[in-house]
UniProtKB/Swiss-Prot annotation:
Source domain of life: Eukaryota
Lineage: Eukaryota, Metazoa, Chordata, Craniata, Vertebrata
Gene3D superfamilies noted in UniProt: Transcription Factor, Ets-1
Limits of the SAM domain: 538-601
PROSITE patterns named in the record: SAM_DOMAIN (PS50105)
InterPro entries: SAM, SAM/pointed_sf
Compositionally biased residues, Acidic residues: 1-18, 268-277
Matching CDD domains: SAM_Samd14
Biased composition (Basic and acidic residues): 19-53, 84-93, 187-196, 228-266, 284-314, 322-338, 346-364, 381-422
Alphabetized SUPFAM superfamilies for the sequence: SAM/Pointed domain (SSF47769)
TM stretches of this protein: none
The protein, known as: Sterile alpha motif domain-containing protein 15
Ranges for region Disordered: 1-108, 147-424
Amino acid sequence: MAEVPEDYDSGPDEDGEPESERPELHKSYENAERDTMAEADSKLPAEIYHEPQPETEEEDFREGEPKSAKNVQLKPGGTALEGIAKESKRDVPSETEPGIPQEVKSEREMGEFFKDLEAPMDETHESDLEPPEEAKLNVTEDVFLESAMETDPVPPTETMSEVSGATVRERNLELLEEGTELGVPEESLRVQHEETGVEPPEQTQLDFPSEKPGESLEETDLQPPKMTKPDIPEETQRESTEKKRTEPPEQARPEFPEKEPRKSSEEAGLEPPEETQPEVPGEMQRKATEEKGTELPERTKPDLPDHKSRKSTDENVPEPLEEIKLEFPEEESRKPNEETILEQSEMMKPESPEEIRKSNEEKNPQPPEETGLVLPQEINPRVEEKTQTKPTEEKNLELPDETKPRETHVEFPKEDRPEPIKSKYSVGKNELEFREPKKGKWSLSDEFKKEYYALGSIRESEESIGTHYEFSQPLQKSFDVSEVCSYLDPSESLTELNEFVHEKEVVDLSQDLKELVSEDDETQSKQGTELQFEHLNWDPEKVAEWISQLGFPQYKGCFITNFISGRKLIHVNCSNLPQMGITNFEDMKAISRHTRELLEIEEPLFKRSISLPHRDIIGLYLEQKGHTGIKSDALTLSEFVKAAGLQDYAPEITAPEENEELPCTEP
């Protein structure tokens, strides 16, 4: 161990303030803290955890002196250093614990500690009393737990409330979807932080390196820059390591890493660090030590409601919240029960401090070290047992019918559900019964109407209809249609529903008519083309019958023997009839004319130009169809027109003169 130099005692006399004044100054701090703590305890009944604060402070000082003397192992000349170090280390955590910046320290004390303790504290840091592994364990994520338990002059019961607050925060994160408890504590905590003006722990860290390097050299060299409590005394580090061995680190690590970022994020928006830094050198450093004594408890106490509220919610939440989560998963999500959540949180908070007071009065005679170890194990189960029995019973009595446990919903699902939605409608049973006989398909029982207007979705209505009632299919369709009018008044919905159904039927009929008309047009066009070219499907016997109907039965054999089918009628003309055996000229002219009329073609006149086609479009198409084969069998007139490029010469032109004047597009 490196020894502290003897010239260390001559430092504090530079500003003319003897060392003997410092214990007196510390005693004045204690007296002021006692007075203000007594006043604050009378104003805040929920802060009973912190009633033994003056006793615990004295006991901490009494127990801290031998430990610190034992650990530091100073020479006899270093007794003044021990007192100064104890004062500085005891004052700094008490001021910095709740997030109060270093603005209450005067410039004179800053200069003294910085000049006198710079070199010796570096040496003592090199000869640190703890091994580096233990110091790193204290400084890492668990430093929030140990510093809150030990360095704060407030008794260590506050740490329990902070730990329980962290567990509440974790459980509330899991229950965030259910909307049961998380929204209210965060809002109340934010309001409390805004009222008390608590600054974020990161702001206190910004002030430490510049103003108090001598006081926290041992701890700040070991701690990372983001730690919020850099001034941990040696005795508290030793005690924290002992408690760390008794308490497994798994309990502290998952709790505080989630709480401290949340606190810093909530408090960061209140006072930015740029505002606190100019206040420290200017006005706040000039305040007298009396103001320090009075402001210290006033600023440390406002954090207590934060811890108390978290404590109370922690004691109430473990099982009641799980019960609420099991009881109302669906009702809480469907119905906006913000008011019931507020009532639950208000019921939990005022009940728990009284029981905390009873349990705390029993535990007050114990010293702070014992209470710090016993409270998380003994007091918590008792308080939780009380609060788990009483709040659940009172909640079941005071909660409205909508938020009763699911057992009641299972027994009476039809009586509870219609009530909140039934209040939306201003129509009684008489009006509904009066309208029933007018419309036959609406004659239903009152219970079904209640259920139908109460049910929120079509699926539930269909389930209730399928399980409790038997309806025909068109009636269910009408109810599906009536879902559109379910948000209207029942008096208006019935009439408007009929109109809507009528309009829907008209619309459906009009759509059906349009579809039918379009289908008819298509079928007519197809039938027209089929009828127009029906003769293409004739066989030679059918053609022979058609010739006999024209008045030439004697030529039936000629058409049958030559296999003149409907497709080959295009070739039946005056030039080809003699080859078939018909030699009578008059008969040839009559048969040729009837064939053109059947095929709807016109033979060109002799005056036409030689560039015009031999046939018109239909004639050309029929000539193409006259060939036998797969392509000619599947060929249609529209396909032929597109393939031949005759779109400009559609068959709409039927006059023979115009047909004769069509230009030739195909050789």
